[in-house]
């Protein structure tokens, strides 16, 4: 009879040595991002990267509510204001220059969207938390000035979330898809015919083909082209001018890239991920007029700081509503 010492034994080697092993996407074109700017030596939940018409970068940290403004040329970091609403999660910029800030509230029913100047003045409730029950995580404008937003509620077996469209006058809210589990990132194709949505806790990528009215789904138009694997899941996303979709993978320290049909074509790794560092990658965004991508992440679990990283993507970023 074979002794225990002589039995076949599993060893940590290769992919099993990584804190976050990549299995199904291991054959994709893979690059590693370079550090671009340290936001804080403290672990802040960075999110919401968005550039204004002058090329200034805005972002926030969710749990403390700080709104940051960064000059990409000088790397100067300013904090123009702090959100008066709890747990802000995204910033999108209107072409009139106002910041639209999505906030999660109590993560149950007190989320909303407010607008403000870049200094935090002239506050306006766009979706107010007192009259609705949304938990709003992200939004994307269309060319008419309306926008789609994601409702972040629910969990894997209790899909309370969804995606909604708000008319350009901000008076009408129309459901697009519902009964999904923690709707998170959202992006609109260059021709505004395809809406991309990430479903975090069910680990799914939704591709929604829209009719010309922007709210009706085409026959058989709502599909799930990709299922993600691993702990946590897909977070915020953006597109480039070739309609490739860049999806940050929260808890995995990487960004996955999909073509316009939803096939994975590449991935970007955050340095230190195999050792368990900087896993909270949340949001990719292009510097306007370039193919240079900025990615935010933080190292809260390992006691590290908060960083922005950079790579070049497949194509230049899409010039969306705020640049029209």
Curated annotation (Swiss-Prot):
GO terms for molecular function: hydrolase activity; metal ion binding. Ca(2+) 2 binds at residues 109, 111, 129, 132, 134. Binds 2 Ca(2+) ions per subunit. Pfam families: SGL. The keyword Coiled coil does not apply. The active site is at 235 (proton donor). Disulfide bonds: none annotated. Transmembrane segments: none annotated. InterPro entries: 6-blade_b-propeller_TolB-like (IPR011042), SGL (IPR013658), SMP-30/CGR1_Lactonase (IPR051262). Ca(2+) 1 binds at residues 47, 137, 184, 235-236. GO terms for cellular component: cytoplasm. Its cofactor is Ca(2+). GO terms for biological process: response to antibiotic. It is found in: Cytoplasm. Its main location: cytoplasm. Keywords: Antibiotic resistance, Calcium, Cytoplasm, Hydrolase, Metal-binding. Induction: Induced by cell wall-affecting antibiotics such as oxacillin, vancomycin, fosfomycin, and bacitracin. Its EC number is 3.1.1.-. Exhibits lactonase activity. Acts in cells with perturbed membrane integrity and is possibly related to the membrane homeostasis. Contributes to bacitracin resistance. Belongs to the SMP-30/CGR1 family. This is Lactonase drp35. The gene is drp35.
């Amino acid at each position: 009879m074979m002794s225990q010492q002589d039995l076949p034994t599993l060893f940590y080697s290769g992919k099993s040595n990584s804190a976050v092993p990549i299995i199904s996407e291991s054959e994709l074109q893979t690059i590693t991002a370079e550090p671009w700017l340290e936001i804080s030596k403290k672990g802040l939940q960075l999110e919401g990267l968005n550039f204004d018409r002058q090329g200034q970068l805005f972002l926030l940290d969710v749990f403390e509510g700080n709104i940051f403004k960064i000059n990409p040329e000088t790397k100067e970091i300013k904090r123009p204001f702090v959100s008066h609403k709890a747990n802000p999660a995204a910033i999108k910029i209107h072409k009139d220059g106002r910041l639209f800030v999505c906030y999660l509230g109590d993560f149950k029913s007190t989320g909303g969207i407010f607008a403000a100047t870049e200094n935090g003045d002239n506050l306006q409730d766009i979706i107010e938390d007192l009259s609705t029950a949304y938990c709003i995580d992200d939004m994307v404008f269309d060319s008419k000035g309306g926008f789609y937003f994601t409702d972040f509620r629910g969990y894997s077996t209790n899909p309370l979330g969804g995606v909604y469209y708000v008319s350009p006058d901000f008076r009408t809210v129309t459901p697009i898809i519902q009964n999904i589990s923690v709707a998170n990132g959202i992006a609109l194709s260059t021709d505004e015919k395809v809406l991309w949505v990430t479903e975090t806790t069910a680990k799914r990528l939704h591709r929604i083909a829209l009719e010309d009215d922007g709210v009706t789904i085409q026959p058989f138009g709502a599909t799930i082209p990709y299922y993600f694997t691993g702990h946590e899941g897909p977070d915020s996303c953006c597109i480039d001018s070739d309609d490739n979709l860049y999806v940050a993978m929260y808890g995995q320290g990487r960004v996955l890239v999909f073509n316009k049909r939803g096939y994975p074509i590449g991935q970007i790794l955050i340095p230190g991920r195999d050792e368990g560092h900087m896993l909270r990658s949340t949001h990719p965004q292009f510097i306007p007029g370039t193919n240079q991508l900025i990615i935010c992440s933080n190292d809260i679990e390992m006691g590290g700081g908060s960083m922005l990283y950079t790579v070049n993507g497949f194509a230049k970023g899409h010039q969306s509503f705020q640049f029209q």
